[in-house]
Amino acid sequence: MAELTQRRDIPRLIEDNVYYCAFNSPKSYGGNSYFVRHPDGNWLIDSPRFTPLLEDRIEQLGGLRYIFLTHQDDVADSAAYARRFDAQRIIHEADRRAAPGAEILVKGVEPFAVHPEFKVIPVPGHTRGHCVLLYKQKFLFTGDHLEWDIEKCALGAYRDYCWYDWKEQTRSMERLLAYGFEWVLPGHGRRVKLSADQMHLELRRLVARMKT
């Protein structure tokens, strides 16, 4: 019974139709990945390990239409999931070497709406091609761009792990002030839910800290 319950709990519901996949992969340095169940096709955000259990559960939930890769570090087993479910992988062209054959390449720094409810926002900094995904103006999947720092009880971004350009990452963070969202769902670190107003305030505070 416990095993059956565990199977039903994977992926694990966060809120609404957004799930945490578990099965974090060492290929992505243990990064988190997420699943969105959607009537127009399901999404995988970054890649977990390819495991029979998760493969079966994703199939039961309707398969995959898109695999959104925030950046080159977190592709893990995305190619295997793409083959299994005939899904289209989305990654910025600047990070495309990590996902050769990706079906959709994001270019430049302009936001890209794959679907009316899903907006890809390029945020270069951690890597040159890092992007975040905004879903329903509520959930922001942030990869390694943004997380919740539980020690400081504040949004965080880390200069020591910025592989491309910190000033560019700061500018990218500031551009996120144009959007409203309640959830930050990171690749590493803690996720957090705040009111949209509080999230905007915390983001402004973070940008100010990054500029000092």
Task: Tell where the protein language model's regions lie, with residue ranges.
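Short His-Asn-centered micro-motif
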Residues: 45-48, 69-71, 92-93
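Metallo-beta-lactamase
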Residues: 2-16, 42-44, 50-51, 56-59, 64-74, 79-128, 161-182, ...
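Short active-site oxyanion
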Residues: 41-43, 63-66
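Conserved beta-strand hairpin/beta-sheet module of binuclear metal-dependent hydrolase folds
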Residues: 7-54, 131-148
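Redox- and metal-dependent alpha/beta enzyme cores, enriched for Fe-S-associated oxidoreductases
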Residues: 70, 77-80, 89, 139, ...
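Active-site-proximal loop/helix segment associated with metal-binding centers of metalloenzymes
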Residues: 23-33, 93-95, 99-102, 106-107, ...
